[in-house]
């Protein structure tokens, strides 16, 4: 089997960041969708950047240093946006009997559990279309490494419940396979070094 990482594939419900595709002779055998989400910010970091440069003796205009515009993590909008996107895409993957994996940072996952309705999401079920994988940064071997922290899953209705919605993206498996096969380019072939 050959493995490919195919970026930006359009499906009903939007774009999927990546597909991990298992193929043989450039024919799709299996696939999983992968969404990556990092934290967004609100405001601008520019004034803080300018103050840092000033502290290190690098000239910046005084107006930039005195700018009091705040910035920070936009937790609510980031979490809500990705849950809405996952809901739009979940039904497509559910109809195909395939998985869509959301990869997020541990603090964002913890925020989502606290601020949205996640109490119904417990454990991992192979039959669920939507999987959440949260990663943490851990100190190991005198360095920092990513480590899988949490794995849970749900279905389309479960994502809707997270958002407080009452839960159509219909596409045929053959159509997705044809789209993926058209993108099985050598530049996307995954080479594992052991």
Please report, for each region that a protein language model flagged, where it lies by residue.
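Short beta-strand-loop-alpha-helix junction that forms the active-site gateway
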Residues: 35-57, 72-75
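A signal for specific C-terminal beta-sheet/loop modules enriched in small/flexible residues
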Residues: 32-37, 50-51, 122-131
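Non-catalytic C-terminal interaction segments of nucleic acid-processing enzymes
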Residues: 60-194
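Active-site metal-binding core of divalent-cation-utilizing nuclease and nuclease-like domains
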Residues: 1-47
